[in-house]
């Protein structure tokens, strides 16, 4: 019997983004680990996991969180340790979105969006996805609209990290408006 896909995916994200060493994995500078070694690490919690199952998770992930190259796998974004990412630059998006609990609004409007414990700020090309992401951190969520051209004019590069996920070093407050 296969374990629940969502649970395995969450564990994959935890391992690949935050704590590979806890499972005996050593990522390279781009965050890749051996696919076989990841499968073995996942089996310590979910013994039924197979490489095929992990590949299905990667192929069907709605946000494009993972990437497989040959016999290696990595998280495409969200790392809390330094990783050299080689993502394509997004030069076309006009507006990006970020959902956040209302309680964070005063500091965001004053200081902008910062990566906090991660390498980059995560934003979305999709309003609904941004709101859903924000709801993981609180019930009363507001939608921030980010002017991508404003970011580019200030020298910030926006990278395509997932299907609708974009990452940027930070977002200054003057590039943010509150959606109505």
From Swiss-Prot:
EC number: 2.7.1.-
Gene Ontology molecular functions: NAD+ poly-ADP-ribosyltransferase activity; tRNA 2'-phosphotransferase activity
GO BP field: tRNA splicing, via endonucleolytic cleavage and ligation
Name of this chain's protein: Probable RNA 2'-phosphotransferase
Family: Belongs to the KptA/TPT1 family.
UniProt xrefs under InterPro entries: Ptrans_KptA/Tpt1, RNA_2'-PTrans_C, RNA_2'-PTrans_KptA, RNA_2'-PTrans_N
Pfam families: PTS_2-RNA
Native organism taxonomy: Archaea, Methanobacteriati, Methanobacteriota, Thermococci, Thermococcales
Cited HAMAP family: KptA (MF_00299)
Keywords for the protein's UniProt record, in alphabetical order: NAD, Transferase
Annotated source species: Thermococcus kodakarensis (strain ATCC BAA-918 / JCM 12380 / KOD1) (Pyrococcus kodakaraensis (strain KOD1))
Gene: kptA
Its biological purpose: Removes the 2'-phosphate from RNA via an intermediate in which the phosphate is ADP-ribosylated by NAD followed by a presumed transesterification to release the RNA and generate ADP-ribose 1''-2''-cyclic phosphate (APPR>P). May function as an ADP-ribosylase.
Domain of life: Archaea
């Amino acid at each position: 019997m296969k374990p629940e896909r969502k649970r395995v995916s969450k564990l994959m994200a935890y391992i690949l983004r935050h704590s590979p060493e806890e499972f005996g994995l050593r990522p390279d500078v781009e965050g890749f680990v051996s696919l076989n070694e990841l499968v073995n690490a996942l089996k310590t919690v979910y013994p039924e996991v197979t490489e095929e199952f992990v590949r299905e998770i990667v192929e069907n992930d709605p946000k494009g969180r993972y990437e497989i190259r040959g016999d290696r796998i990595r998280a495409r974004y969200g790392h809390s340790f330094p990783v050299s990412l080689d993502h394509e630059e997004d030069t076309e998006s006009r507006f990006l979105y970020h959902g956040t609990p209302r309680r964070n609004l005063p500091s965001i409007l004053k200081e902008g969006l910062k990566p906090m414990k991660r390498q980059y700020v995560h934003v979305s090309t999709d309003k609904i996805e941004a709101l859903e992401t924000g709801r993981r951190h609180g019930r009363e969520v507001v939608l921030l609209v980010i002017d991508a051209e404003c970011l580019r004019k200030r020298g910030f590069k926006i990278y395509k990290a997932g299907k609708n996920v974009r990452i940027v070093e930070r977002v200054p407050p003057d590039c943010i408006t509150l959606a109505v």
